[in-house]
Amino acid sequence: AMKKKSWLGMALSGLAAGKWFWWGKDAASFKAIWIAMFDYFKAQGLDNLIWVWTAETGDEDWYPGDQYVDIIGSDIYSKDVETCASRYVAISATYGNKMITLSECGSVGKISEQWAAGARWSWFMPWYDGEEEDGAPIVHADEAWWKDAMGQSYVITREEVPSME
């Protein structure tokens, strides 16, 4: 047991339905692993975990179930504002009782423009810049994107989150 209560987000097995990783073999196996991990952590007394499931288009059969998921995430790369907003709307229509997050993103429309278009992400996490094998730069969130995001009244930083004690 923890002496001081804090919260930890568990974004397990991202991009499962994409079949890029070993946990993406099939929906039944993925759900069995997710539920087994959920039950194990709960049995160990870890009641402060926030379970984040990453949705992909057309993967509803991979969803572990409302009792095992707290927040629905979406990973979006190289998409315009309209695409991001339509993805938010689609997830909201399917999982309307859950918070929705932009769990990974890169080269997407500005947060202010997404918000205006109806994408009310609970949080967002841009992937950091890097470079291609040939040395060409990959920019996922440039300075203008960050200034826009941090300049919005509805965006708060970790330092601004109220204490849960």
Predicted features along the sequence, with ranges:
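Aromatic-lined carbohydrate-recognition surfaces of secreted/lumenal glycan-active proteins
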Residues: 7-17, 34-60, 97-108
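Aromatic- and acid-rich polysaccharide-binding/catalytic face
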Residues: 59-81, 125-127
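Substrate-binding cleft of secreted/luminal carbohydrate-active enzymes
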Residues: 98-165
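Alpha-helical scaffolding within the catalytic cores
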Residues: 54-63, 82-90, 106-115
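Surface-exposed cleft-lining segments at the edges of enzyme active sites
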Residues: 15-28, 74
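N-terminal catalytic cores of secreted or lumenal carbohydrate-active enzymes
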Residues: 1-3
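Substrate-binding surface in catalytic domains of secreted glycosidases
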Residues: 74-100
